Structures are given as structure tokens and as C-alpha cells.
Curated annotation (Swiss-Prot):
Annotated binding of ATP, by residue: G117, T118, H119, G120, K121, T122, T123
Gene transcribed to yield this protein: murC
GO terms under cellular component: cytoplasm
Protein name, per record: UDP-N-acetylmuramate--L-alanine ligase
Cellular location(s): Cytoplasm
Length: 456
């Protein structure tokens, strides 16, 4: 089956339409003239936007929400006994999971760019969004964060270019059709699905092998897990790194907010220089990946430079949320030990007196499987406030808790306290912060609410 099957589809229903990826696909269909309906558990600004675009959306999942539907798309979080999914199966309505449907949307384009990696997918895809828009490629874009340049997280273009993130969870990126595949890094994560790091590496190897012979693999040369899997890939490989790779960054300097400037090097020659407006050394690597993709697409250096310099970050990626009594609040999506360390390192370069980190662990499985790594991740903070674990799709079995993590961190002499409500966190911050402090709100769940309360 190819993208052409959509010629026979008039109405698509999305179960879980409020998610960032599902809403983006729904918006693409609406702008292409399809009828769209959907359901979600709660209302949100994303849902309001889709309603304004013409979508028919229900709050709550009920069988009667399925009306004259040709196709149903559902997320991995939807349970098998979901009444809408049950009705679809009973009535022989075609169903697809989110990744499969995104793959079919991609299949209608010639130049599909899929950005994979345990960390940095949204930021790198966002950088590429700025570059491709500045290069007038008129791309279709689906990204996991909101961007000012496209007024949201989705852009519906009319060209052959399609740019999206490629998530490895449950091997969903194996449903894609990449012409250019990017692997930023490979780390242990999603261990509720993957058995171990070798299982994860095998999935990324399969992803790389999806790229056709005339396509490109963009890979970080400084990640040994990546180096292990790309040796027998049958396409053009472009590698990058700070000290290794075909394309390198040299003469790196940082301004007083931790944003880097650097020279882009190939074969020991300086190609051009770039100034970033997002902090952290990890964003130099993300920018290099974007530059390599640009080279594969023959994008001119002026568009690359302008695209990267015009990028000031995405929603919940080291995002400045506000200031209260000269206390700066920054929010970040970091929820894996590697991401936490990188974000705290970037925060160290930010002008502030003290760093107070508010962290909400994300899922019991991740907290349990990476427990020791979490205990080694918070040395660059003056005070750590731990919220309760955000369960997402999981149930609390009692095997791990934020209190357990806090106890271990305190034994390692980390100044850490456990607070169990957003109100308590906000009250603590109002009492303990001083002018010039930096409050860093971290996590992939709803911890942003604590920051919102503090800023009220």
C-alpha cells in the first residue's frame, strides 16, 4: 500500500488527537481537504486550534464518536479495550497506529528527512525546519515542539520535502521511508520495551537500513553505539563531531548565556562560521547534524547560517518562562540522565547566583531501570527539588519512588528535598529563592505547572 490509498479516504478519526504528533497529522489532513474527527480525554489549546480548522472533536472516548469514518488512527497509549477501537474492529473499519500512518504521509514525498536519536530529536528537527524554510524548499514539517517560524508544530508544504522526528519507542521509526536518516545518539532508554542496549542498537541498525542506496545517513562519529551499527550501511554516510567526523566544529566559544559560536570544518578547511542562539555544547552537535543534512540537500551556506542563527529554541527546550522578583524560570523537557546532565551543564553557563532544579521523574520503568544513573546526574545544581514520579501510561507497583531517589541522592551529599504537590513546590520556591537565582523546571510530564504557579 502507498500514499495513494488516501485517494479512497474521505474521513479520518484520530483516537488521542490532542497529542503533539497526532494533532500535527490531523492538521496536515485538514489542510489537504480531508474530513477529520477525533477524541481525547481533555480539552487543550491544540484541540481548540483543530476545531477552528474544521475538525470534529469529542472529549472522552465513546463508540458513538465513530461516525461515517473510513480510517482510524490511534496512539500507542490507547488500550485494546478502547470503545472506539473496539467499534472499528467490530465494523471492519481500517485502523493504523500513529507511526504507520505517519509513514504513509511521508511516502507521498520524495525527500523524506527523519531525525532519530535518544536525545535531541525535537531541537535538531527544529533547526532543520528553520534552515529548509529559509532555503525556500517549502517543506512539510511535523515536529515535537512549537516553533514561531511555522506558527506551531506543523507546516503543510507543497514540495517533495517532508521533515519529521523518528521516535525509536516500540520501533515506531521502522514504519518510515527516510531518504535522509539522521542518528544523533544511541542511549539506554524505553527499557519498558527494549531488553538492553543491544536491542536498541539493533532497532537503530534496522532504521539505517531503510535508507535507499541513493539516500544519506547522517551520523554522530563520537557515539560508539552509532559507530558499531553503521559499518555495513549501503548508502552515503556523512559523519560529524567535535573531534571526529567528516564535518567538525572548531574554535568553539560561548557567550554569557552559554550560546556557542564555531567554525564549520571539512578536510581541515573552514567552510563558514555559525552563531547559535540556543545554549549548551550539545546544541553544537545538533547544529552539525542539521548542517550535514543541508549539505546532502545542496542547501546554500547563507540559508544554513541564517536558519541556525534565527533559531531561538522550541517549547520546553531550555525555554525562558518568566521572571519573578529577579528570579529567572527556565523550563526544559530533560527526563533522561544524559539529558539532565547536559541541561544542567548549559545552566551553569547562564548568568545566575544559584541553580534550583525542580525535577519530575518520568515513568516508573525509566526511574527504576536508570536509577543509579539518575543519582549521578544532579551535581551541577545547588538545590534539587524532587516531585513525585509522573506515571504516563504506567501503574505504580511500589518498586520505585521519588522518595527512594531522594534518599539515595542525599546519601551522595546532594542538597535534595522531596515535595509532593505543585503548590508545595511553588511555596518552597517563593520562600527560598533570592534575586539572581535560576529556577530550572525539568521533566517530560506536567511539572511545568509548578513553574506556572511560582510565576503567578
Amino acid at each position: 500500500m502507498s500514499f495513494d490509498f488516501l485517494k479512497y479516504i474521505k474521513k479520518v478519526h484520530f483516537i488521542g488527537i490532542g497529542g503533539i504528533s497526532m494533532s500535527g497529522m490531523a492538521e496536515i489532513l485538514l489542510k489537504k481537504g480531508y474530513k477529520v474527527s477525533g477524541s481525547d480525554s481533555t480539552k487543550s489549546p491544540i484541540i481548540d486550534k483543530l476545531i477552528n480548522l474544521g475538525a470534529e472533536i469529542y472529549i472522552g472516548h465513546k463508540a458513538e464518536n465513530i461516525k461515517n469514518v473510513d480510517l482510524i488512527v490511534y496512539t500507542a497509549a490507547v488500550s485494546e479495550d478502547n470503545p472506539e477501537l473496539t467499534k472499528a474492529l467490530t465494523n471492519n473499519i481500517k485502523i493504523m497506529n500513529r507511526a504507520e500512518f505517519l509513514g504513509y504521509l511521508m511516502d507521498g514525498h520524495k525527500y523524506n528527512i527523519a531525525v532519530s536519536g535518544t536525545h535531541g530529536k525535537t531541537t535538531t528537527t527544529s533547526m532543520m525546519s528553520h534552515i529548509t524554510v529559509n532555503a525556500n524548499l517549502d517543506p512539510t514539517i511535523l515536529v515535537g515542539g512549537e516553533l514561531n517560524i511555522i506558527n506551531g508544530n506543523v507546516r503543510t508544504g507543497k514540495s517533495e520535502y517532508f521533515l519529521t522526528e523518528a521516535c525509536e519507542y516500540k520501533e515506531s521509526f521502522l514504519k518510515f521511508f527516510p531518504y535522509i536518516g539522521v542518528i544523533l545518539n544511541i542511549d539506554a532508554d524505553h527499557l519498558d520495551y527494549y531488553k538492553d542496549i543491544n536491542h536498541i542498537k539493533n532497532a537503530f541498525s534496522k532504521f539505517a537500513n531503510l535508507i535507499p542506496k541513493d539516500g544519506y545517513l547522517i551520523a554522530c562519529a563520537e557515539d560508539e553505539n552509532i559507530n558499531d551499527i553503521i559499518k555495513n550501511i549501503d548508502c552515503t554516510i556523512i559523519t560529524y563531531g567535535l573531534n571526529k567526523g567528516d564535518i567538525q566544529a572548531k574554535n568553539i566559544t560561548f557567550d554569557n548565556k552559554g550560546c556557542a559560536s564555531f567554525d564549520v570544518i571539512k578536510n581541515s578547511s573552514v567552510l563558514f562560521s555559525v552563531k547559535l542562539n540556543v545554549p549548551g555544547s550539545y546544541n553544537v552537535l545538533n547544529a552539525l547534524a542539521s548542517i550535514c543534512v543541508s549539505f546532502a540537500l545542496n542547501i546554500d551556506k547563507e540559508s544554513i547560517i541564517k536558519g541556525l542563527e534565527s533559531f531561538h529554541g522550541t517549547h520546553r527546550r531550555f525555554e525562558l518562562k518568566g521572571v519573578r522578583n529577579d528570579v529567572t524560570v527556565i523550563e526544559d523537557y530533560a527526563h533522561h540522565p544524559t539529558e539532565i546532565k547536559a541541561t544542567l551543564s548549559a545552566a551553569k553557563n547562564y548568568p545566575s547566583n544559584r541553580i534550583l532544579c525542580v525535577f519530575q521523574p518520568h515513568t516508573y520503568t525509566r526511574t527504576y531501570s536508570l536509577f543509579e544513573d539518575f543519582t549521578e546526574s544532579f551535581y551541577n545544581t545547588d538545590t534539587l527539588i524532587l516531585a513525585d514520579i509522573y506515571p504516563a501510561r504506567e501503574k505504580d507497583t511500589g518498586i520505585v519512588s521519588s522518595d527512594m531517589l531522594g534518599n539515595k541522592l542525599r546519601k551522595k551529599n546532594i542538597n535534595c528535598i522531596n515535595l509532593h504537590s505543585f503548590e508545595d513546590i511553588s511555596d518552597y520556591l517563593k520562600k527560598e529563592t533570592k534575586p539572581g537565582d535560576l529556577v530550572l523546571i525539568m521533566g517530560a510530564g506536567d511539572i511545568y505547572k509548578a513553574g506556572d504557579l511560582f510565576l503567578k
